[in-house]
Amino acid sequence: MGLFGKTQEKPPKELVNEWSLKIRKEMRVVDRQIRDIQREEEKVKRSVKDAAKKGQKDVCVVLAKEMIRSRKAVSKLYASKAHMNSVLMGMKNQLAVLRVAGSLQKSTEVMKAMQSLVKIPEIQATMRELSKEMMKAGIIEEMLEDTFESMDDQEEMEEEAEMEIDRILFEITAGALGKAPSKVTDALPEPEPSGAMAASEDEEEEEEALEAMQSRLATLRS
């Protein structure tokens, strides 16, 4: 506490160092999330191969869509790391300016990076907090409210994803799932019947496993 009950402001150098530490911590969180999603993706690939052997094209398509969503999520996480690196570089520049000018300066580079980072759900809470602190310190200007409110952008699977689904299925199954089909609706050869009861039980187990896998991937992406 300072005079008249006011909180003593931290020295600019201490603020910059604290921000840098928080950014590095969030980068480690993002790295872990990327690894988790990629590990889960390997399991999905194995499931696609198994489903392809049984001629379950519908299951393969569902899993391929999950892989597309996961790869998009990983791409966004890598982009967020690049933005965080930009902020870290900006913090180094602030320390250099501080030594010469004795105060922190506005940075358009940091501003742009932070505007992107506050939209990433995985790190949004920390980035919003950092943005407010940086605004207060005068490094960035006040961000528009819609920047904060546009975080809920759930992407739908677009028609153009069909080609990506085909490509993934062809790649994972080494061409076994059709010969580079033009549409995912192409039928596969029917598997040979081997007992109705056993097949029904297997299908139920596979559906449960598929739902569990989708749930794990959705949790990792959220």
Curated annotation (Swiss-Prot):
The modification Phosphoserine is found at S200. Probable core component of the endosomal sorting required for transport complex III (ESCRT-III) which is involved in multivesicular bodies (MVBs) formation and sorting of endosomal cargo proteins into MVBs. MVBs contain intraluminal vesicles (ILVs) that are generated by invagination and scission from the limiting membrane of the endosome and mostly are delivered to lysosomes enabling degradation of membrane proteins, such as stimulated growth factor receptors, lysosomal enzymes and lipids. The MVB pathway appears to require the sequential function of ESCRT-O, -I,-II and -III complexes. Residues 59-64, 168-169 are annotated as: Important for autoinhibitory function. The acidic C-terminus and the basic N-termminus are thought to render the protein in a closed, soluble and inactive conformation through an autoinhibitory intramolecular interaction. The open and active conformation, which enables membrane binding and oligomerization, is achieved by interaction with other cellular binding partners, probably including other ESCRT components. Probable core component of the endosomal sorting required for transport complex III (ESCRT-III). ESCRT-III components are thought to multimerize to form a flat lattice on the perimeter membrane of the endosome. Several assembly forms of ESCRT-III may exist that interact and act sequentially. Forms a metastable monomer in solution; its core structure (without part of the putative autoinhibitory C-terminal acidic region) oligomerizes into a flat lattice via two different dimerization interfaces. Residues 196-222, 203-207, 221-222 are annotated as: Interaction with STAMBP. There is a cross-link at K179 (Glycyl lysine isopeptide (Lys-Gly) (interchain with G-Cter in ubiquitin)). Residues 151-220 are annotated as: Intramolecular interaction with N-terminus. This is Charged multivesicular body protein 3. Residues 22-54, 141-222 form a coiled coil. Pfam families: Snf7. Keywords: Cell cycle, Cell division, Coiled coil, Cytoplasm, Endosome, Isopeptide bond, Lipoprotein, Membrane, Myristate, Phosphoprotein, Protein transport, Transport, Ubl conjugation. A lipid is attached at G2 (N-myristoyl glycine). Residues 180-222 are annotated as: Disordered. The record marks V48 as: Important for autoinhibitory function. Residues 2-113 are annotated as: Intramolecular interaction with C-terminus. It is found in: Cytoplasm, Cytosol; Membrane; Endosome; Late endosome membrane. GO terms for biological process: autophagosome maturation; late endosome to lysosome transport; midbody abscission; mitotic metaphase chromosome alignment; multivesicular body sorting pathway; nuclear membrane reassembly; plasma membrane repair; protein transport. The lineage of its organism: Eukaryota, Metazoa, Chordata, Craniata, Vertebrata.
